Structure formats: C-alpha cells, structure tokens
C-alpha cells in the first residue's frame, strides 16, 4: 500500500483519485502533481512502482502544504482572527456563518440543532 504524507492511499483507485484522499489535495492539484511527475493518471495505485511513489512523495513534500501542516495553519489563521476581534473572528467565536450568509432561517450546519424556546402561560 502506497503511503504518502502519512495517508495510506486506497490500492484499487486510480492515482488521480487516490491522491485526493490527502487533506489539501483536490482533483486539480492531483492532476498537476501527476503532470509534474510524469505518472499516468489512469494507473491504479497497486500498479505504481516504488520509483513513481517516491517521485510523487517528493513533489508533494517540496511544493505543497498538506495534512497536519495545513490543518495547523488553518487553525492558527482562525485563532488569529478571533484574537484580533475582527468581524470574521467574532462570527467564528459565536459559531455563526462567516461569509455573509443569512441566519434568520437556515445556517443550521453552523449553528447546530435548533434550541426550541418554550412559552409559559399563567395559570
């Protein structure tokens, strides 16, 4: 099994798709990586030679920020926004949508499940 950037790539998938299992690499990036390395995108991971795997690993390590490093950078960026107290930081802190979406209705993914507010009547 090919292991790149700490991720085991699925053996039965095409290399182009298998590379997208690495956090920070999508389809366009995987196509660029394969073009640089000269590996055929239609090749299955199980059919890759050790040399091809090493070539892919080198290109990814040198040119791309992936997995833990990328996750850490994103987390630090969000933390910085929160610390400086900008609008986006406040939205992150409150768990609301950051990019201008409406919140009167919808936004359930970001807000979480509804908290129903009950009304008490006098007896």
Swiss-Prot record:
Disordered: annotated segments: 97-123
UniProt keyword tRNA-binding, yes or no: yes
GO biological-process terms attached to the record: translation
Pfam family, one: Ribosomal_S13
Keyword hit for Cytoplasm: no
GO cellular component: cytosol; small ribosomal subunit
Family per similarity comment: Belongs to the universal ribosomal protein uS13 family.
The protein, known as: Small ribosomal subunit protein uS13
Source organism of this protein record: Pelotomaculum thermopropionicum (strain DSM 13744 / JCM 10971 / SI)
Gene for this chain: rpsM
């Amino acid at each position: 099994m090919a292991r790149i950037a700490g991720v085991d790539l699925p053996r039965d998938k095409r290399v182009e798709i298998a590379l997208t299992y690495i956090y920070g690499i999508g389809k366009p990036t995987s196509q660029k990586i394969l073009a640089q390395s000269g590996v055929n995108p239609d090749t299955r991971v199980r059919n890759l030679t050790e040399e091809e795997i090493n070539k892919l690993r080198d290109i990814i390590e040198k040119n791309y920020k992936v997995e833990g490093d990328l996750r850490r950078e994103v987390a630090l960026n969000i933390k910085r926004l929160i610390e400086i107290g900008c609008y986006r930081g406040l939205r992150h802190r409150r768990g609301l949508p950051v990019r201008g979406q409406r919140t009167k209705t919808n936004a359930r993914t970001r807000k979480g499940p509804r908290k129903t507010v009950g009304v008490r009547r006098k007896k």
